[in-house]
Each structure stands twice: as C-alpha cells, then as structure tokens.
UniProtKB/Swiss-Prot annotation:
Protein name: Pectate lyase A
Name of the coding gene: pelA
Keywords: Calcium, Lyase, Metal-binding, Secreted, Signal
Lineage: Bacteria, Bacillati, Bacillota, Bacilli, Bacillales
Cellular compartments annotated: Secreted
Organism: Paenibacillus barcinonensis
Bilayer-crossing regions: none
Length: 222
C-alpha cells in the first residue's frame, strides 16, 4: 500500500509539472551526448532520458563524466525527465534556458555552466544530489524560479577556490533536506538572493559570501 501511494504521488508530481499524465514508456537510453545547437530548442515532450553508463558515466561522484545534454549558447531544453543514471546531467556552453526539466536522481551534477553566460531555470525539480545540483564553472548569472529540490548537498555551487563573479537568484521555490547550504561560493564578489521561497531542514541559506553580498525576503521556513 505504501509503495503504491509513493508511485501515485510521483506520477502526480510529473503530471503537475508537464500538465498531462505521461504514458508508461521505457526511458530513452542516451549513448552519446545529445547536442542542442546554438539558439535552438529541444522539447523532450515529457520523456525520460537515462545515460548509458558505459559511454557517458554511471551518475556517481566520479569526475569527468559526460553530459546527457550539451546546450550551445542560447539553446533551450524543456519538458525533459532525466532519470538514473544521469551521468553529468546538462552542460551549458554559454547562456541557456531550462524549462520544466526534472532530475529524478542527480548524477555528478544536474547542470554545469561551462562558459560564461546566464542560466535561466524555470519550473522542474531535482532530487537525490549527493553534492551539488547546479555547478557554476564560469562567471555569469543563474536565475532559478518555481523549482523544487529535495535531498541535496547544495543547490548552487560556484567552482571551489575561484574568484570570478557569479550572481545567483532563487525565487518562488521549495527546497528541503539540504546537507550544506542553498548557495555557496568562495568568491568575494559573487552575490546571492533568495526570495518568496519555502525551505525545510536547511543548515544555512548562504555560505562563503562576503558581507553585504546576500539578500533575502518573503521566505518561509517550515
């Protein structure tokens, strides 16, 4: 009975994100990274994609795994479920837009910014991230809105020991069961802002930011 309830709740979450109840279908196994060209949109139509662990990676914390999706500058990824194994999730080479993407079991990372730009994440969710969900390996901005995350290490992490500027914003989201912090940096010039967000079991919202570089308003702890 408990297992059935869990399945029903999971199906309800997917339905609420994509607007329809998905038909039962085997996940698409990705053998080589799917490249979304510059300025184009990839619409997964609610399908589930998993990495071939032999070619992309097993979704562990091992370094140098390959992404399931690679987005070139200005590309958009939407209506996608990334299952397990997720390898290294999504790589953005410059600005990218992520809409209604769900990571069921985050691999090495859910998404990494590899070249400077702005990452806009709207809707979607991420679960079971042993370490971080979104990794910023280049200067830029990450805007997260209407997002759900649970059982994670950190939501956003700037690459450790780097000093470039990253602007992080989180709005109207729900974050729970965090091991470390929602936003973390080692840079004295990076900024973090959290607004209108519900959170539970979060040790600290911000970590490593310089004085005056963080702000919050309208948030609720539950």
């Amino acid at each position: 009975m408990k297992k059935m309830l869990t399945l029903l709740l999971s199906a309800g979450l997917v339905a609420s994100i994509f607007g329809v109840m998905p038909a039962a279908a085997a996940p698409t196994v990705v053998n080589s990274t799917i490249v979304v060209p510059k300025g184009t949109t990839y619409d997964g139509q609610g399908k589930t994609f998993v990495a071939n662990p032999s070619t992309l990676g097993d979704g562990s914390q091992a370094e140098n795994q390959k992404p399931v999706f690679r987005l070139e500058a200005g590309a958009t990824l939407k209506n996608v479920i990334i299952g397990a194994p997720a390898a290294d999730g999504v790589h953005c080479y410059g600005s990218c837009n992520i809409s209604n993407v769900v990571w069921e079991d985050v691999g090495e990372d859910a998404l990494t910014l590899k070249s400077s730009g702005t990452v806009n994440i709207t809707g979607g969710a991420a679960y079971k991230a042993y370490d971080k969900v979104f990794q910023m390996n280049a200067s830029g901005t990450i805007n997260i809105k209407n997002f759900r995350a649970d059982d994670i290490g950190k939501l956003v992490r700037q690459n450790g020991g780097t000093s470039y500027a990253v602007n992080m914003t989180l709005d109207n989201s729900n974050i729970s069961n965090v091991k470390d912090s929602i936003m973390r940096t080692d840079s004295s010039v990076s900024q973090g802002k959290i607004t209108n967000t519900r959170y539970s079991k979060v040790p600290t919202l911000f970590k490593g930011f310089a004085s005056g570089k963080t702000s919050q308003s309208g948030n609720t702890q539950y």
